[in-house]
Amino acid sequence: MFKNDFQINQAAQHYLPNGLKVIHYLDASNPLICIQLHIKVGSAKENDYCRGYSHFIEHLTFKSTVNYPQNLISEIVPKNGGSINAYTDFDSTCYYLMMPSEKLELSLKILSELAFRACFTPADVKIEKDIIIEEIKQYENDPEGDFGEYIQQQYFRTSPLKYPVLGTVKSVSKAGYKDLLQHYKTNYVPSNAFVTISGSYYEEELLLYMDRYFGPWMDSEGAFQYQIQDKTEEVSNFRMDYRYRKGSTDYLGITLPELAESHPYSDHLLIAIRALAIGKSSRLYRRLVEKEKICASIKVSSLCGVLPGVSIIMFNPIGKGHIRQIIEVFAQELYHLLHHDMEAAELELIKRDLINGWIYSFESMENTASAISAEEFAGDTYKLYNYDKTIEAIKLEEIRLSIINYWKAESLQIYYQSSDNKEWKSVESITVQDFVAPILNAKIKKRAISLKQIEDYANSVEHIPASPNSITRISESYYTLQLTNSLRVTYKHIPNKIYCGFAIASPVSQIMETGHNRGVNYLTTSAMLYGSKYHTYPQIQDISRQHGFNLRVIHHLDTTIFKGKCFIDDLPVALNILSEILLYPTFDNRYISHIKSSTMDNLRREDDYPVTYAFKLWQKMLCGTKTNLDNSSGSISQLKSLRQGDLRKWHESWNFPTQFNLSIVGSISPEEIYSITQKCFGSVPLNDYPPTLHQPMYQSSPKQLRQVKKNIGQAIINLGGFAGPASDVKQNTAFHILAQVIGGDLFSRMFKILREQYGFAYQTGFDFNSINSVGFWNSFVYCDPKDVKPSLKLLQGILKDICENGITADELLTAQNYLIGMNRFDSENVSWQASSIANLIALGYDLDHFLSREERIRNVTLSDIFTTANNWLLPEKHYIHILS
């Protein structure tokens, strides 16, 4: 099946006798289900008496239900190999559950409990109140997120979208048990909800269980009746606004009106904003990030939904002195869009982006359910099933008229956040007229876009037959291929999929670097994406967008992976581009400079984010300052010192034939995979170099406890240490299970004790990472500064208890089932599968190691866990850092 043959079957709809709408979409490709319960209440439907209550209820429902008291849901779901979570936005509260399909009945029972059998207590309210206040503080400590929320509150005047979803410290503090219970009973009713199911199921069985568990749910007296609110666009006035934030690097935000999702011209403005500001192909990105190099990044946030809202274009300036220039470039590019500047070729590529994204959204159960639910809110599911036709029908003149009608200069708002206002004084004189008639830069030439397709290797060259010994079948679905130049290809065949995942991995990585060339692997492999001997970077962008594939590089400590995803009919084109950038990169100095400047700005901004800053300080305690185990890019000074010649020299290490592994996952025959890969890679002469030498560098601090005070209003505790190497497979597997028990998902000890029992922490977690020679672990707690001592004591108590008494059989089983379940969910993603296989084989493992993951997890015993804990978690091995 090819992408041009792609058709989406319509989801079925059913109403229970109580009025609850059930939407179900059958996809039997994997034995999984995703179920989403949507309650049509979010922050946009709250008033001044209940700000943040919808989000508050989302927290409280998990605390206790009739059949699952004491947070039992958070244990039952992972024990059955599933995952459950929830979110609240402007329009709804959504509870979403991923489970093996054989757990359908249990899944529906659990969601029904959340829907109408929650029985939280005043004590629960008190604990969650403290947690939500910490969550609000966490957002306030994010300079970019906090700035976005400030713009949200200033931009809207009458729209309920101006209020934060979490509420405020004041509104949450005053929330009482009775008011919250009333909010739950009033809004959590079948007439104000719907359920979406995507995955593998039998319809008769599904409807039987829906009626059994959701049938008793009834509207209460005075129940909320959902109504579509006024969708009139809010008229804003031109505004220039400066906001002071102590210690903040600079951020610039410019707003543009956004139409409600159900508006007939919402897609027209979506195309316009993509042309202007979304992605690396947008005009603003190419001007400000790539050409002028005065912005590190440009992001667009959408504050919209059922109601019309706003798009916030967020600019991260590099250094000082560029704010006026950024605003002028924005004015120029907006002016060009208004004056017939978009040509058919540019529009065609944006349409391809949108349509390809729509097709990819059906790759996983969760994405499919989310897409169906979004259209249910918009009130027009027809659009979901015919999105390609809707997008193809949009005309250039319609887009221009939409821009003229809705992106008026007099409604623009410009916001600037900084720790000083010196630069703001240079732009305060800007008026509406500067956007109506901006000074245009005659030197800026419009980039030509060619839709001429790359040579189709599948059709222009004869099929290359495989020799008798070049394809070996390993199992029912897996094959190994040997190309004529000895390059190894691993292939997994999955039937009836239009998607292909591919990845090529090498153990050439940052732990081959020394103090003299830190960051060279990151910079080299990042620059390889920016043009080849045969295609410039803009041409590669256009080709990938036209054919609907993407290429990216992933930097692990011990491997580097180039990975991507495409449609099966475009695999020859995608692999040809991949082979070009790997073997014949140009290392254009313009793009090297762009990567360096953007990366260095991001490194500078890291210290603005307390969570990132705290982890860096902890990692320095563990590994020292002269290490190659921290971030892949190295430091700012190390990046500055690297030159084009350094990159070319490092690239020579990428010509190791025995180090490469190309992995592909798709529905093409193994013989055709051989033919395609032989064309793209098989004719390249490769040299037989010696094995890669990994040299991890680290020197721990003699001080194992450090406290830093920055008055951030929160405390961040990092506690961790070294762990066993990945080469000890048995212990490594045991540590992954141990990590889940201590601080993994909602069933972990850290979550249950620090968050649920005592309410000290808004967020807890436990991370574990390892390479062949060393591993390290890190646990973290975000809490109020006054709770640092009891939080640290509880965390140390958890670790001490496990070292002395081990874990329970129930904890072991839950963690095993959870890890196996998550692996199955991840396997829906063909790109993830390909990169996982390539990564392991590049490190010297065979395919059996990948295939036996579940068996290794099942074989871990309580004794293995106890031994592992006592090897690495004892108090004398802890490195503790506290930032407050």
Question: What are the residue ranges of the model-derived segments?
Answer:
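Histidine-acidic residue clusters that define the catalytic metal-binding segment
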Residues: 2-13, 154-193, 205, 225-231, ...
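His/Glu-rich zincin catalytic helix
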Residues: 1-72, 109-111, 181-287, 327-328, ...
